[in-house]
Amino acid sequence: MKYIGAHVSAAGGLANAAIRAAEIDATAFALFTKNQRQWRAAPLTTQTIDEFKAACEKYHYTSAQILPHDSYLINLGHPVAEALEKSRDAFIDEMQRCEQLGLSLLNFHPGSHLMQISEEDCLARIAESINIALDKTQGVTAVIENTAGQGSNLGFKFEHLAAIIDGVEDKSRVGVCIDTCHAFAAGYDLRTPAECEKTFADFARIVGFKYLHGMHLNDAKSTFGSRVDRHHSLGEGNIGHDAFRWIMQDDRFDGIPLILETINPDIWAEEIAWLKAQQTEKAVA
């Protein structure tokens, strides 16, 4: 079964994220558990936790259908010791918040070398950061997102994801989230079913589907291989509809959150309905 949703706002309280997801007929959702552009946040109150869990129960969202995202400020591969420590502390806090909320996944961008250390050193720092966070938490899987490769961001090659996983001690609590826009911008073609087959055959060989814990379904304003991260609505960008239809009809993408981060929230309900219909199309055929 496919879990299909969007990254919804948690404004006014975390419970509202589940309510907003239900309003667009989503069977999955993503959210920030705190302000994504601030380092610190007030601890979660018992009331906030209880209200969130109650809303998820009311609208039938289990932890397998929810893909929280951490703060954009965190850089787990930071070249400077003090800044790395700050990022690690913030990441542990994000993991602990998920733990408190009964969530089992935390999606994050791996990190950037800022032109100050080698890719290999940065990837090793990211893996070490994950190990530290896993040691201090329970039950939450660290889900590494592939990137478009803007600036000095790592994670734009499947080999980067594999190298990070290789350095993580507890393989049962690490996974990846593949963002289609990021992959396309990083040079993984998705414009035809044949290209999708090739890209995900590479993914299976280099990383492995057992590590796929979520996806971000985004078309791309950015051009192929441009290393520029610019999302678009499904079918309106340079990837086109075929990739998303192909994903919907492949059972390797079952049982994980498939999350829209497309640019027009007003049509998320339509995009979700369209994605759901592609599954039915296969079933009828």
From Swiss-Prot:
Cofactor, free-text remark? Binds 3 Zn(2+) ions.
**CDD domains according to UniProt:** AP2Ec (cd00019)
Q: Which residues bind Zn(2+) 3 per the record?
A: 182, 229, 231
EC number(s) per entry: 3.1.21.2
What is a biological process (GO) this protein takes part in? base-excision repair
**UniProt keyword terms in alphabetical order:** DNA damage, DNA repair, Endonuclease, Hydrolase, Metal-binding, Nuclease, Zinc
Positions that bind Zn(2+) 2: 145, 179, 216, 261
Q: Which cofactor does it need?
A: Zn(2+)
Tell me the Gene3D superfamilies matching this sequence. Answer: Divalent-metal-dependent TIM barrel enzymes
According to its UniProt record, this protein's enzyme class is: hydrolase
Source domain of life is: Bacteria
Please list the reactions this protein catalyses: Endonucleolytic cleavage to 5'-phosphooligonucleotide end-products
Name the SMART domains on file.
AP2Ec
Q: According to the UniProt record, which cysteines are disulfide-bonded?
A: none
One GO MF term attached to the UniProt entry: phosphoric diester hydrolase activity
- Which InterPro entries does the record associate with it? AP_endonuc_2 (IPR001719), AP_endonuc_F2_Zn_BS (IPR018246), Xyl_isomerase-like_sf (IPR036237), Xyl_isomerase-like_TIM-brl (IPR013022)
Decide whether keyword Nuclease is in the record.
yes
Q: Which residues bind Zn(2+) 1?
A: 69, 109, 145
Briefly state the protein's biological role. Endonuclease IV plays a role in DNA repair. It cleaves phosphodiester bonds at apurinic or apyrimidinic (AP) sites, generating a 3'-hydroxyl group and a 5'-terminal sugar phosphate.
Q: Of which family is this protein a member?
A: Belongs to the AP endonuclease 2 family.
What is the protein's name according to its record? Probable endonuclease 4
From the UniProt record, report the name of the gene that encodes this protein. Answer: nfo
